[in-house]
Every structure is written in C-alpha cells, then in structure tokens.
Curated annotation (Swiss-Prot):
It is found in: Secreted. Keywords: Disulfide bond, Glycoprotein, Glycosidase, Hydrolase, Metal-binding, Secreted, Signal, Zinc. This is Sphingomyelin phosphodiesterase B. Its cofactor is Zn(2+). It comes from Dictyostelium discoideum. Disulfide bonds join 77-151, 80-145, 108-119, 212-233, 582-595. One of its GO terms (cellular component) is extracellular space.
Length: 637
C-alpha cells in the first residue's frame, strides 16, 4: 500500500483546483496572522496566513495518511509538499502516467472525494498535465504548493516591476458626462454554463459536481429539477433562450455593444471531451449571433471552463486547439488578421468600438492559479502583460480610451498574486486611458476599485480611486444564483460609464408560475447613492455601504442576485462586512489582506482596552472571519 502515497498530490489538486466543485473545498481563506508584524508591501501577509493553516482545515482521512507514513499533525502546506515529492520520486523511478492515474483513482474513491464514476472520468483528464509539469527539473514541491496556494509563494521573478515605454503623464480626473448626453448601451453576459441535457424532474442533489440529468434519477420535492431550472444545477436551454428573447424584446437594437466573458460549457467536468467543449462554444455562439449578430458589436473573452480539462491552458502553442476553435466561432467579430493571430496564439485580442474607443479582450487564464502549466512561467505567460502595455501605450499616444474585458477578475484568489500585482501597476499607469474593466467567473454580483497614491512621487500621500472592476453575475443558476445579466449606459462620445442596471429572473417564481419574469433588479447609482460610475463615485459607494447597514444588506442580496440564499444568511456579522468591504477595495488580491488588517485596526481604534486585550480581540475577529469564509461564503468556479 505504500506505493499509493504519490497520488496524494492529485488529491491535493482535486481540492485546490475546484475540480470537484465542492463548496467547502475551494481556496484557503485562513486569516490567523501575526498581529504585530504585518507588512503589506509584499507576499509576507498572505504567506503568514498560509503558514498558520492547521490540520483541522485539511478535511483528510488521518488514519489513511498515517498508513502512508505522513505526520498528520502537519499543515496543508506539509501535506501538499509530501504529495508532490512522492509523485516526483515515482516519476524519477520511471513509473508511468497510467500507474499514477490508477493510484489517484483508488484514493479518490477510497476517501469518497467523488463518486467512482467521477473519479474514473476526472483523474485521467488531469494525469498528463500533472505528470508533465512535475517532470520539469525546476519544479519543486515547495514551489508548486505555493503556486496553488497551500504554502508561501515566492514567484521566480520576485520584483514584479513593469517597465513602461514612457513615463506617466499628469493625471487628468475624469469629467462625468452630462445626463443629457447621447448614450450607448453595453450588454454584459457571463458564465452561461448551459446544460443541454438538463432534465426537469431529475435529482438536483445527486452527490456529483453537476446534477439534474437523467442518469441521476428522479428527485423528490425541493430536490427535483424544476421546469426552468434549479439553484444547485446549471441553467437549461429553455431559460437561456428566455433571457435572450427578453433582452431582444426589451432593448432590441438599443444594444450597441456586447461583452460576453466566457464559461459556456456546463460543470460536467469529468465527462467532457474536445468535441463537447467545442460544441458548447458553438451552441452559445449561435445564440449570440441570432440575437445580436446583425445589430451589435460583440466582444467575447475566453473563460477557464473552455479548455479540456478545466483550467488547463498550456503555454503557446499548446492551447491552439481551443484558440483556433474560438477563432472560427468568433470570426464574425474578430476578423482583423493581426488580432486573429493574437487570438490563435494566446487567446487575447484588441479591436476598436468606434473612433477614440477600443476593447482589449484578455485571456485571464494566464493568471489562473488553477492552470498548473503556469508553474513553468507565471511571470508573463504568452507575453500578454507586455502586449497589454504596448496596446495601452498606443492608445494613450492617440488619445484613445479603452475597456478591458476578461473572465477571471484579478482581485480574487484564483489569480496569481504576482501577476495580479503587475496588472495593478499597468492599470494605475494607464488610468486615464482605461475607462473600466469587466469580468465574470465568480458567478456573483460585485465590484472592486483600484487605488493609487494621490501623489505618485510621495509614497506617504493618501490613496485615491483610479479605476473600477465590474463583475457581472452569472447567467447560470450554479449555485444559488438567479439568472442575471447587466446593461451599462455609457456616453456615446467618450465611452464614460453613466449607469449600471442589473436584471434577473426569480427562478423559484418561474418554476411556480410556469414562466420566468425578467425584471430590473437595481440601478447602481440609486442603490448606493452616487452620482455616476467614475472611480471616485464607486469609492464613495464603498464608503456608503460601509456606513449603512441597510445598504450593506442590499449589496449582500445583490451579490447572490436576490436568490433565496442571502435571505437565510443575512449580512449582520463583522466578518460578513469585513469580507465585502475588503473585496471592494482589493482589485489585486494581496490588497485584501492589507485591507482586513486596516479595517480591524480601525474597528478597535476607539476601544479603551490595553494593547494586549486589543490584540486578543483582533485575533478573535480574524478567527471569526476565517470561519465565516470557510463555512458561509458560497464559492463557484
């Protein structure tokens, strides 16, 4: 049995990469930090957090690991390094992929990570990637485990300094457009995840990553898939078509631009094939063409679920099969030779909207820490960061404004820290060129703000808002989400954002009434009492939410698109508030840790206790936050 130790690695990957999509197993959010030595200028904050993970968070079978010869008092970091080292020993002894896959399937089944059929389908999909990456001579257990988030991560290029071709010109604050200005409308849809074999009446709680299918058998009561969908499953084609029909009827030719930011396939990640992935893209492409192909300019972006297996994007030219397929599907819109070449090379491109305004579509899988291929090069995979700089510089030189669109927001744990920090530098350098950024991936409705020094020559100067990320809620209901889309109203002349309007349908009511009713859920300016969507106004929105419990609860409800979940879990705790406020203030993920400590210190500022008692209170707040993040915040991927 000792030979089975190596597949511990694959077990770790199953947990961390969200392969099993189990809500309690995504990301490490442990916040037990040394209160006295907090330095927010580097990775030390996050690494202290990771180092304090303990075995209570591992959810592993201790008896099994003791049989493997592993000390179960170790941290998740220790477990990960142990597994990596064992696999690398197995590779060095010339044992093959088939051996590792067999052992991984045995472990996956033995520990009930997934049902046997899921283990048998899922693990072989990842075996080649795992074997190949761990065969790199420079890849160590410590490095890989840091990369995936279980250990302190030290990127090979630790400076992360971007060299810009020209110095930054003096900042010119944006002038909000007049309310009477002519406008355009941008439709943003993301994370459709349509399941073409969804079947009403089937079991929605089947114990697999995706249910509501005929092989799952019939469900009973609330666990039966509804006619229009179920909160535990991906969306069905019937509901997707209803959404597109509503948009067409309500807005018609008023939609000028469509941002479509990826993730078309369902979450049946253990059953997927090259053909199924391509077919999923074609299915959604045909819908977008049907409703907007002749009336709007469409700008797609690639998601992490487009590849096979999920999250897996080898460095160029290793991902050419999916990039070429998408290039074919998107040929009505991405049809300039130079940009077709960029798309086929790295999954990114840029195109003009009109004179003075362009879109840069990013492949955010080059920052995805679920993409193990980036262990080989996480500094600037596919040269996309340098390409972004070159493209933005060209736009700045001619006074052109830019929208950034992509799938994975850079301020969440799924984006590699060092890469995220580099993008932060780029956005702040070109803040007067970039109008806003638009992402999806989390399935939730959220926004975050970039900040920079008010005087960039003075590191002690106060911070000011420089740009904004808008994360649009998903079309899919997976998980606990009402189907949603967003309409931005923008100034026709300048492209400046004026309003953000989010629409959804109540899935429970759709199933009850026999048809969905699509409604405006909220307008951002009215809900958060701000005049417009400039970075300064969105920073004001954060201040308003921070000072108003009712506004915070509104944000909480909108975060889940007014699904039943927030009604059962109101945002009344310090932890809930801390999490939301710091997400809003963290367009780069390491800023989240900085924000947490800043907010907690402010909270304790007026306490009359001595320092030791304050330190104890702070630790308790951080422990409560850690528990909240691991047990109450729903994750999607």
């Amino acid at each position: 049995m000792k030979v089975k130790a190596p597949i511990l690695l694959l077990f770790v990957f199953l947990i961390n990469f969200c392969f099993s999509i189990k809500q309690t197993q995504q990301q490490n959010f442990d916040i037990t930090i040394d209160n006295n030595n907090y330095n927010n200028n580097n990775n030390n904050n996050k690494n202290e957090i990771i180092n304090n993970n303990n075995k209570n968070n591992n959810n592993l079978n201790d008896e099994y690991f003791e049989k493997l010869g592993y000390d179960t008092n170790g941290t998740k970091c220790d477990i990960c390094k142990f597994g990596i080292n064992q696999v690398q020993k197995m590779i060095a002894s010339k044992q093959g992929i088939e051996d590792i896959s067999k052992y991984a399937i045995d472990l996956c089944t033995y520990l009930h990570i997934e049902k046997a059929e899921v283990c048998n389908g899922l693990i072989p999909l990842f075996a080649n990637m795992t074997y190949n990456v761990l065969s790199y001579p420079t890849v160590t257990g410590e490095y890989v485990c840091g990369f995936v988030g279980f250990c302190p991560y030290v990127p090979r290029n630790s400076s992360n300094i971007i060299n810009f071709p020209k110095p930054k010109p003096p900042h010119v604050p944006p002038v909000a457009p007049s309310p009477n200005s002519p406008t355009m409308k941008i439709l943003h849809i993301s994370d459709i995840h349509v399941d073409p074999v969804y079947e009403s009446g089937m079991n929605a709680d089947c114990g697999e990553p995706l249910c509501c299918r005929a092989p799952n058998g019939p469900g009973v009561g609330e666990k039966a898939a509804g006619e229009w969908g179920h909160y535990l499953c991906d969306i069905n084609m019937k509901m997707v078509e209803s959404m597109f029909e509503f948009i067409d009827q309500e807005f018609g030719e008023d939609i000028d631009i469509v941002f479509w930011t990826g993730d078309n396939p369902p979450h049946d990640i253990w059953e997927q094939t090259y053909d199924s992935q391509i077919n999923a893209s074609q299915l959604v492409t045909n819908l977008v063409k049907k409703y907007f192909g002749s009336t709007a300019k469409v700008f797609p972006a690639i998601g992490n679920h487009e590849s096979l297996p999920v999250n897996s994007f080898p460095l160029p030219p290793g991902s050419s099969w999916i990039f070429n397929a998408l290039s074919y599907d998107w040929s009505d819109w991405v049809n300039v030779d130079e940009q077709v070449a960029n798309l086929q090379y790295g999954g990114y491109y840029t195109l003009p909207v009109q004179s003075g305004l362009r879109v840069i579509s990013l492949n955010m899988n080059w920052c995805n820490n679920g993409n193990l291929y980036l262990a080989e090069n996480s500094t600037d995979p596919a040269n996309m960061l340098q390409w972004i700089v070159d493209t933005l510089q060209a736009s700045e030189d001619i006074g052109e404004k830019v929208y950034l669109v992509g799938h994975i927001p850079p301020g969440i744990p799924d984006c590699i820290d060092s890469w995220s920090e580099q993008l932060l530098q780029i956005v702040n350098r070109y803040e007067d060129t970039i109008l806003a950024s638009f992402y999806g991936h989390t399935h939730r409705d959220e926004f975050s703000v970039y900040y920079t020094q008010s005087d960039e020559n003075d590191p002690s100067s106060p911070m000011r808002a420089s740009n904004v990320i808008y994360t649009t809620p998903s079309v899919t209901t997976y998980q606990h989400q009402n189907p949603s889309f967003r309409i931005f109203t923008v100034d026709s002349n300048t492209g400046y954002l004026m309003e953000s309007s989010t629409y959804h349908t109540d899935l429970s009511q759709a199933n009850l009434n026999g048809k969905p009713t699509w409604l405006l859920e909220y307008n951002t300016t009215n809900t958060y009492n701000i005049p417009n969507l400039t970075p300064i106004s969105m920073d004001l929105a954060i201040q308003n939410i921070n000072s108003s419990n009712s506004m915070l609860e509104d944000y909480h409800v909108h975060y889940y698109s007014a699904s039943p979940y927030p009604e059962s879990k109101p945002c009344t705790s310090i932890s809930c508030k801390l999490d939301y406020i710091c997400k809003m203030k963290s367009a780069a993920y390491l800023k989240y840790y900085e924000c947490i400590h800043h907010e907690v210190n402010n909270y304790l500022l007026n306490e009359s206790d001595d320092d030791s008692i304050k330190s104890h209170k702070k630790l308790n707040i951080l422990l409560d936050l850690n528990n909240y993040l691991n047990n109450e915040v729903l994750k999607s991927c």
